[in-house]
């Protein structure tokens, strides 16, 4: 059985991070089509991702640094109010996207998905930068 620490390290594999970035908006498709089992399948894949990838070869890839930065941010989310605001806005936009998916309003759903992904990539960029600063300055 995989230990939680191993799962965290494997979850920083770049492919794992990029797939997670795509899977959350993909959760809207089952809502659109009214096939909730599809959402359960996507959520299962989401949870199994760390088991599907090896530990990253190094820490030089942007997504690996971003995932490590997210882990640091999670320990002190109130220390970065801008990051917290980005996450809150991103979650709110996904909730709004769920509403538009249920109504099958494609235009507003697409707008919400683009906004969510943009905000989350900005958040990841901040986390990668924070991780780089921490590695440069020391813990």
Identify the meaning behind each predicted range.
Residues 19-28, 83-98:
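Core segments of transmembrane alpha-helices
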Residues 4-37:
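Long, highly hydrophobic alpha-helical transmembrane signal-anchor segments
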Residues 28-41, 97-110:
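Helix-coil boundary and interhelical linker segments in multi-pass alpha-helical membrane proteins
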Residues 38-39, 52-55, 81:
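Structured domain cores in non-transmembrane regions
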Residues 49-65:
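Membrane-water interface of transmembrane alpha-helices
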Residues 65-85:
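Juxtamembrane helix-capping/reentrant segments at transmembrane boundaries
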Residues 104-139:
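Glycine-rich, aromatic-bearing surface loops/beta-hairpins
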Residues 43-50, 88-98, 113-123:
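Hydrophobic core of alpha-helical transmembrane segments in multi-pass integral membrane proteins
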